[in-house]
Swiss-Prot record:
The keyword Transferase applies. Its EC number is 2.3.2.8. This is Arginyl-tRNA--protein transferase 2. Involved in the post-translational conjugation of arginine to the N-terminal aspartate or glutamate of a protein. This arginylation is required for degradation of the protein via the ubiquitin pathway. Component of the N-end rule pathway with ATE1 and PRT6. The N-end rule pathway regulates seed after-ripening, seedling sugar sensitivity, seedling lipid breakdown, and abscisic acid (ABA) sensitivity of germination. The end-rule pathway regulates various aspects of leaf and shoot development. Involved in the oxygen-dependent N-arginylation of RAP2-12, an activator of hypoxic gene expression. The gene is ATE2. The keyword Transferase applies. Keywords: Acyltransferase, Plant defense, Transferase, Ubl conjugation pathway. Residues 518-541 have a biased composition (Acidic residues). It comes from Arabidopsis thaliana (Mouse-ear cress). Residues 496-549 are annotated as: Disordered. Belongs to the R-transferase family.
Amino acid sequence: MSSKKAKTKNEASSSRGGIGGESIVADCGRNKSTCGYCKSSTRFSISHGLWTERLTVNDYQALLDSGWRRSGCYLYKPEMEKTCCPSYTIRLKASDFVPSKEQQRVRRRIERFLDGELDAKPSEQTEDQDVSFSREVSVSVKKSLGAAKREKNNELEPIMKDLSEQIDNAVQKCIQSGEFPSNVQIPKASVKKVFSAKRKKLAEGSEDLLYTSNIAFPIVAAMKHTQTLEKGKNVEENRLSPEAVSEKLLSAMNKVGEFTGFSVKVSKGHINFLSATQVTSSDRNEGEESLCATTIKSSSNKLHARKRKLEMHLKRSSFEPEEYELYKRYQMKVHNDKPESISETSYKRFLVDTPLTEVPSSGYDDEEKIPLCGFGSFHQQYRVDDRLIAVGVIDILPKCLSSKYLFWDPDFASLSLGNYSALQEIDWVKQNQAHCSTLEYYYLGYYIHSCNKMRYKAAYRPSELLCPLRYQWVPFEVAKPLLDKKPYSVLSNISKVSSSSSSPQASETLLESTSEHEDMEQGDTNDDDDEMYNSDEDSDSDSSSSRNRSDITNILISLNGPRLRYKDIPRFKNPVVQKQLESMLVSYRKVVGAELSEIMVYELR
């Protein structure tokens, strides 16, 4: 290969930051199929497809931001002006997210489940998941709340008693070491549960404050009383402050050992017990990439009183029989699929296979721009007492976490695991932005305004929709009036609709459905390859042939190995073949954009 050709190949590899190598795509052309959303019997769902087995995370990020999505190794983009159900890419800036009342209830429902106050119910025992939380708390449940509260308090008493005893032991150690006088009658320690209203008074940044003890204050008072009784003693000179006493007690407790499930701190003379988060890296063989597998005992980290343990594990996309069995149960129970329609092959093709090149968290110049888990495709497992109850299929990219699919155990349908997993994924983006500053967004896939099952996506506010023409992000509240009028709209034409026409009051009318956050209907899972890739004969060949050839001159093409710009490829002897190729390249450039057409490698097949 000449130096010029080598340079051309290197340009493609390095143009997106030098991570992940190069992207290679094959154009599948236009595809017409029946629609899984409007359930049309005719082939009115129209999209353009690409096949790829190698795609960099940067290039996929750029494709997402121009309306593409992936199903396994197949990339597809709706032809918005022609398809029956225009699909708009929807995203949310994680740092701006404001949970709705219903989303907060979903979190509380999980908390109650983990506390043992609420049992999960299977699909047949639950009503529509968009019912309000007040309907779940029936009259009979309300009558039992008092008893449940008393039971919970009884469970917490041994914890407070144990913490009190540990403080008492620390007091004795301070006396033995001479830090506290031995002739002082020191009272027994008392530990109390902290309620949210009092947390800010006791400590700054005390969202996770669970228990507190003010033992330092009676100790100081007892010392003062004893010293006052001793004649000739300079009381002020020898007096310890509550802050100093609590620090000495904390030091003594730390020498004994760590408090399981708690972080102990002192503030304003109080000894505070905060919840602790346990984060561990997954065990791995030598040479295996670090996956940043995170174990979270519960969403609020209340390790002490949980009857059930919730854990989340992030792992690279791979086939696991346990996940496949859960997927089969989910498809049959929730989507009413027949067992014979589900196969290991289709499951792998849909949810395991990925073209994304793995990017580990180390080994690159811009390590500070890569999260600890790296970039690529992942499965997020949710386990309750080690039982797999849900799996979220996600892509982690330079600018976002893209949610692809979620399947869950039908026995846990009442917990709204789709909504809960979305909230967890939003939290993940917030937490990891500290390490990867570019990772700001949560992508929820496609939004179809006419599909009621999609409405829950717009309930994650403030969300944005991608304009299908200019690829600009438009606030949902601005886009909604346009979509109310017609399914396809150039959303960036905001001059026609005042942003004030969509009021906050109007936005409250959105149905906050708890339909699980899935990007595709079941039809996308079991489509035969022949149907998916069947290119429509109604092409744009006539119009494309009249386009200026210079538009496609810099498209990077693979010719059985070598990478060449189209302008460097010798002309074909057959003008018909030349015309067909140029027509294909014009169409390809149109759907992926000029920039990506010169970066990704176009593979001729």
